[in-house]
Curated annotation (Swiss-Prot):
GO cellular component annotations of the record: nucleus
Gene Ontology biological process: intracellular protein transport
Keywords (A to Z) from UniProt: GTP-binding, Nucleotide-binding, Nucleus
GO terms assigned for molecular function: GTP binding; GTPase activity
Residues reported in the UniProt entry to bind GTP: 23-30, 71-75, 134-137
Protein name: DnaJ homolog subfamily C member 27
Species the sequence originates in: Danio rerio (Zebrafish)
Keyword GTP-binding: yes
Protein's UniProt keywords contain Zinc: no
Gene name, Swiss-Prot/TrEMBL: dnajc27
Stored Pfam families: DnaJ, Ras
Superkingdom of the source species: Eukaryota
SUPFAM superfamilies reported for this sequence: Chaperone J-domain (SSF46565), P-loop containing nucleoside triphosphate hydrolases (SSF52540)
InterPro entries associated with the record: DnaJ_domain (IPR001623), J_dom_sf (IPR036869), P-loop_NTPase (IPR027417), Rab (IPR050227), Small_GTP-bd (IPR005225), Small_GTPase (IPR001806)
Length: 273
């Protein structure tokens, strides 16, 4: 075989990609990476100082993928180090601890920081994101359930996996799906392919479900001010009912959100003359 032809074939098969991990300190980013790359779990917490860098090789179909992994420190102190490593990423692993709600709520701020460093939303659109709901083995301390995490991820077009760095649950499946999607993107000219199947719900539905989950009281849940009239309560209820009725909305958590709205309306109307 001609040497040049052989080299071209080898170059076609070989692919080099850059992946970064994001999330608050102590959510298990480094442990997830070590579990996959080194097949081990490190029980003692060792804070990442700035950036940890590693390289691994994986096989995706007929291609060898050389993955450069940049494990970002989650502490705010290391922002000036992190901000140098966002650009030119093909994949992002977003991690939160299912037992720490603040780590889940912080996912939006991590995306904001990344967007700020990337320069524009367009640069974010051709990156594969995967969300890891980590430490699912610690069931008794869980405060963010699967439906809430899945809703947040899927409403943004991100992959979602339940993982445990300690037990290994979901780790291999997550990385296999992640690297396969990155490969598909690279083979599609660096553009994220349009998913064959849509998630089946809108961002408005997803945001509404999350708002209802986080509501302080029945007034807040329906989006009306305390002291609202019967007509205002019913109008707000009807709008939410149309948006979230389980027969029309397949978003994770929609059934519970709809029930909560029904109960909120009933509770408020009892006290309105």
């Amino acid at each position: 075989m001609d040497t040049n032809v052989q080299k071209r074939r080898e170059n076609k098969k070989s692919l080099r990609v850059k992946v970064i991990s994001l999330g608050n300190a102590e959510v298990g980013k480094s442990c997830i990476i070590k579990r996959y790359c080194e097949k081990r779990f490190v029980p003692k917490y060792l804070a990442t100082i700035g950036i940890d860098y590693g390289v691994t090789k994986v096989q995706v179909r007929d291609r060898e993928i050389k993955v450069n992994i940049f494990d970002m420190a989650g502490h705010p102190f290391f922002y000036e180090v992190r901000n140098e490593f966002y650009k030119d990423s093909q994949g992002v692993i977003l991690v939160y601890d299912v037992g720490l709600r603040e780590s889940f709520d912080a996912l939006d701020s991590w995306l904001t920081e990344m967007k700020q460093e990337m320069g524009s939303q367009a640069n974010m659109e051709n990156i594969i994101f995967v969300v890891c709901a980590n430490k699912v083995d610690l069931t008794k301390r869980r405060v963010v359930d699967e439906s809430e995490g899945r809703l947040w991820a899927e409403s943004r077009g991100f992959h979602y996996f339940e993982t445990s760095a300690q037990s290994g649950e979901g780790i291999n499946e997550m990385f296999q799906s992640f690297f396969s999607s990155i490969t598909d993107m690279c083979e599609n000219g660096g553009k994220r392919p349009t998913p064959e199947v849509s998630v089946g719900f809108t961002k408005e539905q997803a945001d509404t479900i999350r708002r209802i989950r986080n509501s302080k009281d029945s007034w807040d849940m329906l989006g009306v001010k305390p002291g609202a009239t019967r007509e205002e309560v019913n109008k707000a209820y009807r709008k939410l009912a149309v948006l979230l009725h389980p027969d029309k909305c397949v978003a994770p958590g929609s059934e519970d959100a709809f029930k909560a709205v029904v109960n909120a309306r009933t509770s408020l109307l009892k006290n309105i003359k």
